[in-house]
From Swiss-Prot:
It is linked to Epilepsy, familial temporal lobe, 8: A focal form of epilepsy characterized by recurrent seizures that arise from foci within the temporal lobe. Seizures are usually accompanied by sensory symptoms, most often auditory in nature. The keyword Disulfide bond does not apply. The modification Phosphoserine is found at S116, S117. This is Galanin peptides. Transmembrane segments: none annotated. It is found in: Secreted. GO terms for cellular component: extracellular region; extracellular space; neuronal cell body; secretory granule. The gene is GAL.
Amino acid sequence: MARGSALLLASLLLAAALSASAGLWSPAKEKRGWTLNSAGYLLGPHAVGNHRSFSDKNGLTSKRELRPEDDMKPGSFDRSIPENNIMRTIIEFLSFLHLKEAGALDRLLDLPAAASSEDIERS
C-alpha cells in the first residue's frame, strides 16, 4: 500500500512538473483579443462612434455617437472640398457664359495661338 501511494505521489509530482514546464498551467489569467474599449483607444473616436450593437434600439441615441453634421451653417468654411469644387465649377461656367454673351470671347479667336517657350527658341 505504501508502494502504491508512493507511485501515485511520484506520478502527480511528475505531471505537475511537466505541465508547469510546458506552459500548460498559467498562474494569472491572460486577457487576449480585441474589445470595443481597446479598439476605441487604438483607433480613435471616429472608428468607435459609428459602431452599433444589436441591442441598440432605433430612435435612441447613445453617449458615444458623434456630433451630427446637420449643425453646419450655410456659408461656413467647414464645407468639404468636393462641395467647394462643385461651386467653383458652376461659377466659372456662369462667368464663361456671361463673357460669351458679352462678346468678349470673339476677340480671343482672332488672336494667334500662344506659342510655347520651345517654339520661341526655335524661331
